[in-house]
Amino acid sequence: DVYKRQLEKNELFGGCFQTYQRGGHRMDTGIHYIGSLDEGQIMNQYFRYFGIMDKLSIKRMDEEVFDRIYYKDAIYDYAMGHERFMETLCHSFPHERENLKRYVAAIRSVGNLISTDHLKKGRLSQEGMDFFATSAAGMIASVTTNRDLQNVLAATSLLYGGIKNKSTFYEHAMINNSYLESAYRFTEGSMQVSLELIHIIRANGGTVLNRKEVTRILVKDEAIQGVEVNHEEILESTYVISNLHPQLTLSLLDKNHSIKPAFVSRIKSLENSYGIFTLNLMMKKDCCPYQNHNIYLHGNEDVWYEKEMHKGNTPSCMISMQVPRGNSKFTEVVSILTPMYMDEVSKWTDTTPEHRGEAYRQFKEEKTEQILQFLRRFGFHWNHCIEKIHTTTPLSYRDYTGTIDGSAYGIVKNYQYPQISFVSTRTKLKNLFLTGQNLNVHGALGVTLTAMLTCSEFVGQEYLAKKVGNA
């Protein structure tokens, strides 16, 4: 029964792909749009190999604008396709054509590290450590001295938990390049990806179980023996692949000599990204016109989120509209995401969902009002359309996705110390492997690639890459 059991601690499968119901409405947890899904592009190729591409209900976002940026009383559009992206921004920055050309070439070169051509040649990814050691903000500044353009190019940094003096150009480029290739929304919620994958796993003889929280990883004679589930049941296994945060994985391990204290303290010392406060607005019928692009609002001259400076405020947010059902021209759910560190909700650290008390409810109400006020500054007067409001905080992320500190993206990759935040898929303990958003890059693309790197430890990289590339 090797590699055949998958355990999920929650009722719902899928981590950030979870879609939950509130009052007849679907809410997505984390994946609001996905890139590189056009024919021949990398996510399309992976999903085709997994056998799920033709089963997904997706909607291609607008080519002319898939991300709209509000910055300093002006509006800038990210258009799909590298050329179109460049031409569109040239309307606003006519003297920056050559610099935009250089920027596009730079992010493309990072995106090309994981092309389908590499897969066909038997390589999952080309080595990109140089880009991990390059600052995202620094790279943008080296391309253009125009402050406004620098900020417009960094305006979607919420997607990777952007921190100005830490974020790597690798993450910035990998994620932005993916959306420039093609950007899609899920029409029936992002959880369909998890559900389709589960069908495939089961069809291939695997077992996927929910409400099975791993509470201990068993080790004997410096080798994995299996896991304990919900503090009671023992499941024996030869291998364990953990997609938990490495800090959590290490805390579950039985005592052993293979994993050195120095490694444990390095992992413990790593900083985690900020979390997200999400405001889900359930809209009245036929009231809020659907827009087939995301909106990023920035209230400050500097678009990067700063922990100390912005604590308790809303300096920026992302707005994502749910694709309407049927032929309706109106959206039923609008999600608004804004950065928030765990510090802001630390008072309620020891509580569980639905039992956090009145003060927590009040905190969420005040934050909601602050965000709605922020939206009104940009002309989004939606109060008359709102039927109901549902919110989540970093605590919700912690309790439903098991992240440390309620972090949205896990371990912060710091370009100044790329090796320190780099975690390998293989551990020093025999038959324990790691995967998930804390290794390499987070997000649908990053996690897929990391899963492949983990699997290649079992079947070999060349074999696996060619299987995917020729799917």
PLM region descriptions:
Residues M174-I224:
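Helical element adjacent to the flavin cofactor pocket in flavoenzyme catalytic cores
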Residues R185, T215-K329:
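Mid-domain catalytic core of redox enzymes
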Residues V2-Y3:
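Short, small-residue-biased leader/transition segments that mark boundaries at the very start
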